[in-house]
Amino acid sequence: MGDDGIEWELEDLDGGVLYDVFYESTTMLAGRMLAQRRLAAARGDRDGERRAEADRHGLLAARDKVGPTDRRTLIAAKRSNDAARGARAEAVAPWHAVGGSLKVDVEGIWRDDIRPVVDAAERSDKPCTVFVGGQPGAGKTRATHLVRVSGLHDGPLLPVNGDDLRQYHPDYDRLCDEEPLAMPERTAKASAAWIRMTMEYADENGIPAIVEGTWRNAATVLDEAANAKHAGRSTHAVVLAVPPVLSRLAMLERYY
């Protein structure tokens, strides 16, 4: 491990874990930009609000262009994301005192922040839903990217990822800094609701989608597949068969 720890570790990560680490760092930076936008809105700073949203939009657009096998770019982008997030820490600090005290307006956040993103996705006369399943550390995010560019569906697939949706929780950015181990549990209820709303909207509006999850609750996945079928969509399942010991090592590599 190098003097700074993280950089040396990045060089050693395998492909699937490296892509997931890069992707997570992008989500965390996007969450900070979202917190900055909300802080600017609360202050009536329209210019600051627009700047934060433009930065966030550019970040997420750039993320989708990075290939999962481009190690050089993945490592550089991960480091850049971490540096950019750190540089915004002081500016976003006032939001941390606000976000933790707010009641989570699940419907309002869906309406104002998430639905516009979903609504911008491309429609299809023959929509499909792809379900990607595997345990934590299996490389689901990398697999999702590979499926999206594989040609399985003739057109774009809207990615639906519970970890991505956590960033919309008003306390997400503070939790990532101060209580990272508690963050998944604290944001789980809202994230699950937003997944459900996103899938319902995709089904109703003919938006092809790819859904990533652990499939911990088989009934939930089967219900979503049945809903998709009832909506006239084709369905596909992508299952990652990864030995438990490898996924455990992947989680250790990712967080330590």
What spans do the regions from the language model cover?
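Conserved nucleotide-sensing/catalytic segment adjacent to the nucleotide-binding pocket
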Residues: 154-159, 164-225
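The conserved Walker
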Residues: 135-136
